[in-house]
């Protein structure tokens, strides 16, 4: 049975999304087929008041969910680096959680180290190694752009590997 997984890389300025379809083989000898359904970003302008930016994320994420019809959503967990950046990302994550709740969608969360480990076998891999693994695993000619979309596909793949 096909499974649709939507990966999300939350952010206020740019929220990356990447959706994959996973179809298990009929027998143990047949491998799972994983395909890219869609990927991209939702952007908000720094010139707009933060409340309106959050509304834009919310509305646009609803549109993405309605179009892609995921079975499960995978989200990158919040990474603490600078307090001001962490607060802004936490606000965007709150909007994401609200949208998922309104769609009655189950979700899983992964730390950056878990994602790196799942895709490269090394929890301290750098961004380029993860992006190359995404392109290789999904049989893409190029690394998905922008980076936020590639990161979201990495989150979706991690969810698939954990199922």
Curated annotation (Swiss-Prot):
Coarsely, its chief localization is cytoplasm
**Source taxon at top rank:** Bacteria
Give start-end of the signal peptide. none
Q: Which residues bind Mg(2+) 2?
A: 76
CDD domains tied to this protein = RuvC
What reaction(s) does this enzyme catalyze? Endonucleolytic cleavage at a junction such as a reciprocal single-stranded crossover between two homologous DNA duplexes (Holliday junction)
Keyword terms: Cytoplasm, DNA damage, DNA recombination, DNA repair, DNA-binding, Endonuclease, Hydrolase, Magnesium, Metal-binding, Nuclease
Complex and partners: Homodimer which binds Holliday junction (HJ) DNA. The HJ becomes 2-fold symmetrical on binding to RuvC with unstacked arms; it has a different conformation from HJ DNA in complex with RuvA. In the full resolvosome a probable DNA-RuvA(4)-RuvB(12)-RuvC(2) complex forms which resolves the HJ.
Name of protein: Crossover junction endodeoxyribonuclease RuvC
Point out the gene that encodes the protein.
ruvC
